[in-house]
């Protein structure tokens, strides 16, 4: 094998491939809620149900069942505290039917007092106009005494929501 052939072969294998596989949701969300540790299983269920009932279906009247009053919010679009949370999400519209599952849910991880839900996120492709690609979005919660005490996600500042 010539030096040129070796160099070309190495260059081929060293070149990054940009054909990422699409992110796909978990086929069995009930399995994601399981844990050998009862506390972790309870924390997963709390975060999952909060997401289904309060965030997705906007049953804001049930927020106190899941959240502490002094809830800490790290999303730059919503205020800290349950009152600020409700004020922000009330702008998105009224309650909707509560689904049995969360659309696009990929995984639920729990460790200590933290639970992370990750989701499929479809985005406009900036390189290929008119096309979409998938990536991952997440919401992380800190649980304190059986209620959500703190929240993080990957949100950036947005225009004020409207109904």
Residue spans of the language-model regions?
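Hydrophobic helical h-region of N-terminal Sec-dependent signal peptides
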Residues: 8-12
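C-terminal and inter-domain tail/linker signature
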Residues: 19-163
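Bacterial N-terminal signal peptides that target proteins for export
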Residues: 1-7
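N-terminal signal peptide c-region/cleavage motif recognized by signal peptidases
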Residues: 14-16
């Amino acid at each position: 094998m010539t030096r040129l052939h070796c160099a070309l072969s190495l260059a081929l294998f060293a070149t990054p491939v940009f054909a990422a596989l699409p992110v796909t949701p978990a086929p069995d969300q009930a399995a994601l809620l399981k844990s050998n540790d009862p506390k972790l299983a309870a924390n997963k269920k709390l975060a999952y149900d909060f997401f289904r009932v309060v965030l997705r279906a906007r049953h804001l009247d049930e927020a106190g069942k899941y959240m502490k009053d002094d809830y800490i919010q790290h999303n730059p679009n919503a205020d800290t505290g349950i009152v600020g949370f409700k004020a922000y999400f009330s702008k998105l519209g009224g309650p909707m039917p509560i689904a049995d599952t969360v659309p696009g849910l990929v995984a639920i991880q729990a460790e200590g007092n933290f639970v992370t839900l990750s989701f499929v996120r479809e985005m406009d492709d900036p390189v290929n106009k008119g096309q979409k690609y998938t990536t991952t979005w997440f919401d992380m919660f800190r649980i304190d005494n059986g209620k959500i005490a703190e929240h993080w996600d990957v949100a950036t500042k947005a225009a004020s929501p409207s109904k």
